[in-house]
Amino acid sequence: NTAAGSNAAQTKKGGKYVDSFMGYLNYYDPIYFTNKVFLHKACAQDVPDTTNALGGILCLWNDVRVDDKTRIALHNGMINGMMVYAERFWNGGEGSWDELSEFEDKMSYHKSHIVKNHDVRWHPNAMTSWKIKIDGNDTLYARGGAVDVNDLCTENSITVGDTVSAWAFTNFNSECDTTIKVWVGFEAAARSNRISGGIGPQGKWENQGRLFVNDKEYFPSQEWNGPEKYAFHFNTWHKPEEELPYTDEQFYWMREPLSIDLKQGDNEIKLYIPKTFRGQRWSFGFLKVTE
C-alpha cells in the first residue's frame, strides 16, 4: 500500500493508499491545522474513492519532553484536530472556506455539548480575512484566525531572506463601542522541535511582533514567567534542548486572552509580523475568544 504524502502523484500509480501527509497534530498551529485539514484534498482525490482511498493517519508525536502529560492534548489541539480530521476523511474531497464557516457551527456545538467537560482551545475564525504586505512583494491575501506565512509564500512562489519585515491587516466591524477578548501570537512552535524565537522580553510579544488596534498599540496582558528564554534558532532533534518542556506561555492559544477596545463601525487591526531568523516557524494568530 502507498502512503499519500507530499507527493500526491503517488496516488495515481494504482493500488490502495492512506493519506499520511496532513495528520501531524504536533507540527502545526492548532488553529491553522483545523482550517488547513478542512481545506485539504483527502487522499489527493477530487471525488471520494472508497475502493483505493483507505483514509488518513492522524498522529501526535510530541518529541519535545513533556513534564505534565495532561497538557499534551491542549498544546497540540487534539480534540479540535480530531473533529476536523474525521469530517474531512469521512466525506473525502476537499472543503471551501464557506463550507468551513458552516462546519465551525458544528464544532462549536460539539465543544459546548459533546466535549463540554474538556478544555478545547479553539474558537470560530474562518471569516477573518487578511491583507499581508511583505517588504519587496505584492500584497498577499489570507483567511482564518491563524496564518502560516511560510505556507503563504510557498503558495505564491515568493522567496524571502532570513529576515524580512511584514505587516498583516484586517478589519473587525462592531455594532457598538465594546471590549472583546482575543488570542494574539507571533509564533507557533512545533511540539516536535524546539526551534523557536522563544518567549518575548517582559512586556513585549515574541519574535518582535507588535499589535495595533485603531493605531493604539497593545502589549501582552500577562507577565512572562520566563522572559527571553528558549530562543533556539536551530533544529533541536537529538540535542539537549529537546529535553526542555514547553510551558503554556509559549503557545498563544494557552495564554490568558487580551482585552482590546473596539469602536462602533470598522476597526483596523494591524500586526507587525517580521521574519526574524532562518528556519523560523513564521506565522501569526489573532482570533476572537467567544467564551
Regions found by a protein language model. Give the residues of each.
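Flexible, acidic glycine-rich loops studded with aromatic residues
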Residues: 1-132
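Beta-sheet entry/capping signal
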Residues: 14-18, 55, 181, 208-210, ...
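Extracellular structured ligand-interaction cores
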Residues: 53-55, 79, 167-169, 208, ...
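Generic structural motif
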Residues: 82, 178-180, 186-188
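Accessory carbohydrate-binding/adhesion or oligomerization-edge regions at the termini
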Residues: 108-165, 171, 185-191, 200, ...
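Extracellular and analogous surface-interaction loops
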Residues: 168-181, 258-264
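Beta-strand-rich ligand-recognition modules
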Residues: 194-285
